[in-house]
From Swiss-Prot:
The lineage of its organism: Bacteria, Bacillati, Bacillota, Bacilli, Lactobacillales. One of its GO terms (molecular function) is glutaminyl-tRNA synthase (glutamine-hydrolyzing) activity. NCBIfam families: gatA (TIGR00132). GO terms for cellular component: glutamyl-tRNA(Gln) amidotransferase complex. Heterotrimer of A, B and C subunits. Allows the formation of correctly charged Gln-tRNA(Gln) through the transamidation of misacylated Glu-tRNA(Gln) in organisms which lack glutaminyl-tRNA synthetase. The reaction takes place in the presence of glutamine and ATP through an activated gamma-phospho-Glu-tRNA(Gln). Its EC number is 6.3.5.7. This is Glutamyl-tRNA(Gln) amidotransferase subunit A. One of its GO terms (biological process) is translation. The gene is gatA. Belongs to the amidase family. GatA subfamily. Keywords: ATP-binding, Ligase, Nucleotide-binding, Protein biosynthesis.
């Protein structure tokens, strides 16, 4: 029996009433994963034994009637540390790495008696926008298996969209939660930088990375964020902000709220069908009583260039720790210490990772630092100031999540610049450290289209409030792909 059409609250009621046990729910989830895995390829590791052991222990202890997450399975992106469960970052470099500690986000989930069911596929070290750079496999879009799921958190998105799991965790450095959420018709949120601890997240761009939730609905997304968020002494970038319940404003009226629509987000490079969907959503918000006005974010056009200098520079530094000495892959034919370093990194990293390491090393090198990295930091400040000016007068910003719907497999993975430009609408949010959500807003040629709502720092509750207002008066989130029992 499958329970994947039940909401978290419905599952909780079944567990509390003992109509099902945690073991039965876990077994059913494992069956859902197995039944769909060949078609979509969401997982790198399925933690059957560990999950069933945890579920049995929970049944013996008893489900907490006051904890809606008690006994709920959770899929975790494979760059988030899980004690005793392989954490590979989808790289040959870490193909056999089994952490001895949990990431804080995972530990928080365990504290709420959630059950980690497996680790999801991703772009190698989270570097990519299509989940095609994984060392292990290519994940496929839940709606059309000839298309990409987005990236880098593609596996976490398809696991939810295809009905393998109800909830999952991803990470977002330049759009890696929101873009795959848009491509697969699910809800994905990138929290404010520092709202969720980065302890245990394998670092890509340390000033940009953020762990966040995927779910089929806005409420369930907010419920999962309430579990994983919070300040953490183990993370020096963790914000001293503690919000117990991110669902607190869900259901409140949005009448009179001012929402900005940047003209740059509907300009050159945006598919006309995506633009049409976003404008229709804007009109829908007006019917709900919100005030929609056009604004300008003039420096957002520089976001992609700024991002790939800063992110690659930070990556070149962060990835220096992978050298074949203490853990992970080591080249077998090395004859000296220098040989170990050179051959291990040459053989262990994929092409995209090596490309970004080289770009970052160049940007940080003597004679080029001022022209590239320092200049990128200055333009980043201008992007931040653009957002601050808008949020002085508006509650939220509205726009598309991605310039197109999901593209076909093997079409952009050999064109790095085209792949990078696919993130032009999500990258500015990371550069500014802001929260943003992608929610289902329609379809273009049968493929899901995501709507992005961006807020000032620590405004997640308001974002959820507005997102639910849209979700509750539309049915896009209810439409499911054929693999999940839908008719598309």
């Amino acid at each position: 029996m499958s329970f994947n059409h039940h909401t978290i609250e419905e599952l909780h009621e079944l567990l509390v009433a003992k109509d099902i046990s945690a073991v039965e729910l876990t077994k059913a989830t494992l069956e859902d994963i197995k039944a769909r895995e060949e078609a979509v390829g969401s997982f790198i590791t399925i933690a059957c034994e560990a999950a069933l052991k945890q579920a049995a222990a929970l049944d013996a202890k008893g489900i907490d009637p006051d904890n809606v997450m008690s006994g709920i399975p959770l899929a975790v992106k494979d760059n988030i540390s899980t004690k005793g469960i392989l954490t590979t970052a989808a790289s040959k470099m870490l193909y056999n790495y089994e952490p001895i500690f949990d990431a804080t986000a995972v530990a928080n989930a365990y504290d709420k008696d959630m059950i980690v069911i497996g680790k999801t596929n991703m772009d190698e070290f989270a570097m990519g926008g299509s989940t095609e750079t994984s060392y292990f496999k290519k994940t496929k879009n839940a709606w059309d298996h000839s298309r990409v799921p987005g990236g880098s958190s593609g596996g976490s998105a398809t696991a939810v969209a295809s009905g393998q799991v109800r909830l999952s965790l991803g990470s977002d450095t330049g759009g890696s939660i929101r873009q795959p959420a848009a491509f697969n018709g699910v809800v994905g949120l990138k929290p404010t930088y520092g709202a969720v601890s980065r302890y245990g997240l394998i670092a890509f761009g340390s000033s940009l990375d953020q762990i966040g939730p995927f779910a089929p609905t806005v409420r369930e997304n907010a419920q999962l964020l309430s579990v994983i968020a919070g300040s953490d002494r183990k993370d020096s970038t963790s914000a001293p902000v503690q919000i117990a319940d991110y669902t607190i404003k869900i259901g409140q009226d949005i009448k009179g709220m001012k929402i900005a629509l940047p003209k740059e987000y509907l300009g050159e490079g945006i598919d006309p069908k995506i633009k049409e969907t976003v404008l229709a959503a804007a009109k829908h918000f007006e019917k709900l009583g919100a005030i929609i006005e056009e604004v300008s974010l003039p420096h957002s056009k520089y976001g992609v260039a700024v991002y790939y200098i800063i992110a690659s520079s930070e990556a070149s530094s962060n990835l220096q720790r992978f050298d074949g000495i203490r853990y992970g892959f080591r080249a077998a034919d090395a004859k000296s210490l220098e040989d170990i370093y050179v051959k291990t990194r040459s053989q262990g990293f994929g092409d995209e990772v090596k490309r970004r390491i080289m770009l970052g090393t160049f940007s940080l090198s003597s004679g080029y630092y001022d022209a590239y990295f320092k200049k990128a930091g200055q333009v980043r400040t201008l992007i931040i100031q653009d957002f601050e000016k808008v949020f002085a007068d508006y509650d939220l910003i509205l726009g598309p999540t991605a310039p197109t719907a999901a593209f076909e497999l093997d079409t952009l993975n050999h064109d790095p610049v085209a792949m990078y430009l696919a993130d032009l609408l999500t990258i500015p949010v990371n550069l500014a450290g802001l929260p943003a959500i992608s929610i289902p807003a329609g379809f273009a040629d049968g493929l899901p289209v995501g709507l992005q709502l961006i807020g000032p720092k620590y405004s997640e509750e308001v974002i959820y409030q507005v997102a639910v207002a849209f979700e509750a008066t539309t049915d896009y989130h209810k439409q499911q792909p054929m693999i999940f029992g839908g008719d598309r």
